[in-house]
């Protein structure tokens, strides 16, 4: 008694084809950037004539606080925070903390520090992950040019 396995026809997705053609182009562009880090390309001032990909990033940062902590925001600060975007609110909180130290932090520095901390936390949770301490120090101490 032979049981035949039913065969299903799978159609190719046009999205899959687009991804397969786009990813090698992206890899080639990344390799070019790695080979020429000081290239003439200014990503902040692109003309309308050149093609580029713009990616929007949404990042949320929550810091765990004790339940018995009292919010230091006054009513006016809360109202002001509602009128600005989430990223601006986070930057203001971050800069208000660092103003006491006399530092003004750029958005790039802010994101770099938060992403580095998140990556470090992920590495600490993975028991099998191993990273060279010199690499970690280099990641933490690297500053972007302003």
From Swiss-Prot:
Positions of the UniProt region annotated as Disordered: 119-146
InterPro entries to which the protein is assigned, alphabetical: NOPCHAP1
Encoding gene (name): new4
Molecular function terms from GO: box C/D methylation guide snoRNP complex binding
Taxonomic superkingdom: Eukaryota
Basic and acidic residues bias: start-end ranges: 119-128
Matches recorded under PANTHER family: NOP PROTEIN CHAPERONE 1 (PTHR28674:SF1), SIMILAR TO DNA SEGMENT, CHR 10, WAYNE STATE UNIVERSITY 102,-EXPRESSED (PTHR28674)
Pfam families: NOPCHAP1
Full protein name: Uncharacterized protein new4
Native source organism of the sequence: Schizosaccharomyces pombe (strain 972 / ATCC 24843)
A GO biological-process term: box C/D snoRNP assembly
